[in-house]
Design a protein with these regions (language model features):
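Charge-rich, solvent-exposed alpha-helical interaction surfaces
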Residues: 39, 115, 207-210
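Extended repeat-based interaction scaffolds and adjacent low-complexity, acidic/S/T/P-biased segments
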Residues: 5, 72-73, 88-90, 118-119
Length: 290
């Protein structure tokens, strides 16, 4: 069994540059913990003193620049608390940000790109540029890691999956070009589709929201583990295999339903809970509420 804690003084800095140790930036995290808000305000004034008065052309984002910054800083902190070596994958092109999507409840937009670039220029973030088919990677640089180390902010005060929609509709797999067919063994990605609610989607969302609320009130653990993760072998490209870590922290409790090929009649399976990835050997060790 593991206990939530802070990285030790000796282990609070990044020591590995493995960009495969990463996860996507989570745009559905939030917290109003006072000490964290103080850090947000301090860094905002330091690095973006005139941002709120800047007038930009084009339609205005529903989320302020400061909300973008706070969400980014919060997920960087959660990532660092999980593993100081871990990176976050981020879109650095405007097309990767859909502010009005139902799958982006905080309405974050391509404003995030400018904020990331400024923090990289100020050596607040480490940055690894993405290659074809991969996202760019960021993580807290040493000066930000030092601030995180001194921040007494328990992850239990973070709201995960904030306003996140648990009902997802995906389209058909994108058609590969000839080169992709020859060089890649990855499954083709299905695009996420926008949709209009129906009485049935509203009903399904209500059921899942209640289920996820129940999960958030419970403590889920694997008593035989000394660290908050387990590893499973996952095939990557060609014959190469890699152990992939699945964390059993609160950010991996959210359960969603995914429908396929643009139809509510196809798919509908449940995904998201870390317990769905656990081995049969560890399954008997799952513990609820100690």
């Amino acid at each position: 069994m593991y206990l939530e804690g802070y990285p030790s003084m000796n282990n609070c800095f990044s020591t590995s540059n493995d960009i495969n140790n990463s996860r996507p930036l989570d745009v559905h995290v939030w917290s109003d913990y006072p000490e964290f808000n103080q850090l947000v305000n301090k860094l905002w004034v330091k690095y973006f003193p005139s941002e709120d008065s800047t007038v930009r052309p084009g339609p205005k984002s529903k989320a302020t620049s400061k909300v973008h910054f706070k969400t980014l800083l919060l997920d960087l902190y959660v990532c660092w608390m999980t593993d100081p070596n871990m990176y976050l994958g981020v879109h650095m092109s405007n097309s990767g940000w859909k502010a009005n999507s139902r799958y982006n409840a905080l309405h974050l937009s391509y404003r995030m790109i400018g904020i990331i670039k400024e923090l990289v220029a100020e050596d607040v973030l480490e940055f690894q540029k993405g290659r074809q088919g991969t996202l760019s990677r960021i993580r807290a640089a040493e000066q930000l890691q030092l601030l995180f180390r001194d921040l007494k902010f328990p992850v239990s005060e973070v709201v995960f999956d904030y306003l996140r929609d648990p009902i997802i509709l995906r389209g058909m797999s994108e058609e590969p070009d000839e080169m992709e067919v020859q060089t890649s063994s990855k499954k083709l990605k299905k695009p996420t589709l926008e949709y209009d609610d129906t009485p049935e989607t509203i009903r399904m969302r209500g059921v899942l929201n209640k289920y996820n609320e129940l999960l958030n009130k419970k403590s889920l653990d694997v008593f035989s583990l000394e660290e908050p993760y387990f590893e499973r072998i996952k095939k990557k490209v060609g014959k190469e295999e890699k152990d992939v870590r699945h964390y059993i922290t609160g950010r991996n409790h959210f359960v969603r339903r995914i429908f396929n090929n643009g139809s509510w009649e196809l798919g509908g399976r449940f995904y998201g809970g870390w317990w769905q990835q656990i081995s049969k050997e560890l399954r008997p060790d799952i513990m609820i509420n100690d």
